[in-house]
UniProtKB/Swiss-Prot annotation:
Entry's Gene Ontology BP terms: maturation of SSU-rRNA
Protein encoded by which gene: rbfA
Record-linked HAMAP family: RbfA
Organism expressing this protein natively: Stigmatella aurantiaca
Similarity remark: Belongs to the RbfA family.
Name of the protein this chain belongs to: Ribosome-binding factor A
Keywords on record: Cytoplasm, Ribosome biogenesis
């Protein structure tokens, strides 16, 4: 059985709560397109939650999405605090997750090598 620290467990709960907000369409800002919450890192004192997201699109679309998410931070903070039942309301920061794009790039390169080598 794996043991998780409290910040990790709270991060998982925050990720699920924000996912529900997105699924239910409660973030109505048109700048926020189809995004996926890839992870949440919570500070040890539970006062800060860094939310990582990924999306397809151009750099301009990512910038607009970031603006929309930044504008929705207060709403997300209130909803997360209520859903996760926390005494402290964590400050929420949204960060684009570059690792998804890097993973796609690595997959593409591996496929190219496979084709060239005839695997």
């Amino acid at each position: 059985m794996t043991t998780h620290s409290r910040p990790e467990r709270v991060g998982q709960e925050i990720q699920a709560a924000i996912g529900q907000l997105l699924t239910r369409g409660e973030l109505r800002d048109p700048r926020i397109g189809f995004i996926t919450i890839t992870g949440v890192k919570v500070s040890p004192d539970l006062r800060v939650a860094q939310v990582f997201y990924s999306m397809m699109g151009t750099a301009q679309e990512r910038a607009e999405t970031q603006k929309g998410l930044d504008a929705a931070k207060g709403f997300v903070r209130r909803e997360v605090t209520a859903a996760v039942n926390l005494r402290v309301s964590p400050e929420v920061f949204f960060t684009f997750d570059e690792s998804v794009g890097e993973g796609d790039k690595i997959d593409r390169l591996l496929r190219e090598v496979k084709q060239k080598e005839g695997w």
